[in-house]
């Protein structure tokens, strides 16, 4: 029987059951947004269990009503050895639409998705369903939401963190799935053709050209969303992902921290605050970007956002980038339960 390790009113709950350890995000009214308190408690539990010889299996449980998996919540899912998604899961990285950039390690993850799918997802904010997440490599197993409770019970009863044993249990409950016929993953040839272009302007120009071809009616609404995003954020995001293709995970995290700090400090402009105003405060969905067009964004301004800090101000991260995306793993097994999703509460 699992034993509660924290106040039931706390924003993160920790449980222990034999060799299993369970982390549950507990902010339903805030859609389980990842705040500084959540990050602090996650670190407390994970650092404690990393030193616990009896801890063999760590299960993350993320659940909320609207089904979105984005921001910090998505970053908790993608690197895990086993990431379980359900029919209710929806994934997105729409940060550019609010004047931010694709952070939380996604310049690393997106740059390693098939072809130029990562650039497409980051620049357009397009959503993927669970089947598409599996196909793209963002999740490992599809389990019907009605089976999650029984799957969790089976995992909690495991007395081992052995990878093959955990995999065998999950595969008892999982179903092989393929993207639907109209899935964006069946349009990768078009995406690769357009989003491999060197600049955001060239990407949009190529995408507009493809939109005129019969059968490409799906492009018009995507273009509309792309044009609504912050021009500055789009350029920062594309450069970050392109750099990510040649960077390690620690290098990407360090870079993303630098970008976030410079954006929040309004080194170039205040687009992120304007985006938040339009989306969350006034909710008019009519942000006034500065500058208003891609052509007006100066290369030297983008360079300023990427400018390194002094060594003592840079993010300090471990040099080891062991994770599913690097094809190496830590001894302990982590399992993500995503009954619905999570997001980043900045």
Residue ranges, per PLM feature:
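Structural signal for hydrophobic packing residues in well-ordered secondary-structure cores
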Residues: 46-53, 114, 125, 159, ...
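Short, histidine-centered active-site or binding-site loop motifs used for metal coordination
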Residues: 25-29, 95, 241
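Conserved CoA-thioester-binding segment of acyl-CoA-metabolizing enzymes
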Residues: 1-61, 313, 319-332, 336-346
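Intrinsically disordered, low-complexity segments enriched in small/flexible residues
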Residues: 1-4, 145-346
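Hydrophobic/aromatic residues within transmembrane alpha-helices
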Residues: 23, 60, 76-77, 132-133, ...
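Conserved catalytic cores of soluble enzyme domains
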Residues: 63-193
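An acidic, glycine-rich surface segment that forms the CoA-thioester-binding/catalytic face
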Residues: 47, 62-66, 106-108, 304-315
């Amino acid at each position: 029987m699992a034993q509660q390790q924290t106040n039931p009113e706390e924003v993160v709950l920790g449980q222990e059951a034999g060799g299993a350890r369970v982390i549950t995000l507990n902010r339903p009214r805030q859609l389980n947004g990842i705040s500084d308190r959540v990050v602090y408690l996650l670190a407390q539990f994970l650092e404690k269990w990393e030193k616990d010889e009896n801890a063999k299996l760590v299960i993350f449980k993320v659940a909320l009503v609207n089904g979105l998996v984005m921001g910090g919540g998505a970053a908790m899912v993608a690197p895990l050895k086993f990431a379980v998604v359900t029919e209710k899961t929806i994934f997105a990285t729409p940060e550019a639409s609010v004047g931010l950039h694709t952070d939380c390690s996604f310049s690393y993850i997106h740059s390693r998705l098939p072809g130029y799918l990562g650039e497409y997802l980051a620049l357009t904010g397009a959503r993927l369903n669970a089947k598409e997440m599996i196909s793209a490599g963002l999740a490992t197993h599809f389990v019907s939401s009605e089976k999650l409770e029984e799957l969790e019970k089976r995992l909690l009863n495991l007395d081992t963190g052995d990878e093959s044993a955990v995999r065998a249990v999950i595969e008892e409950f999982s179903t092989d799935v393929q993207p639907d016929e109209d899935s964006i993953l069946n349009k990768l040839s078009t995406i690769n053709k357009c989003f491999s272009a060197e600049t955001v302007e060239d990407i949009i120009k190529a995408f507009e050209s493809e939109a005129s071809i019969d059968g490409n009616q799906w492009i018009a609404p995507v273009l509309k969303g792309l044009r609504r995003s912050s021009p500055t954020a789009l350029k920062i995001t594309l450069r970050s992902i392109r750099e990510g293709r040649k960077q390690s995970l620690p290098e990407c995290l360090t870079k993303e921290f630098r970008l976030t700090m410079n954006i929040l400090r309004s080194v170039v402009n205040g687009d992120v605050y304007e985006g938040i105003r339009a989306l969350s405060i006034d909710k008019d969905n009519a942000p006034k970007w500065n500058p208003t067009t891609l052509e007006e964004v100066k290369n030297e301004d983008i360079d300023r956002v990427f400018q390194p800090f002094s060594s003592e101000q840079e993010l300090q991260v471990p040099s080891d980038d062991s994770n599913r995306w690097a094809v190496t793993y830590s001894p302990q097994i982590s399992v993500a339960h995503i009954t619905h999703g999570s997001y980043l509460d900045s």
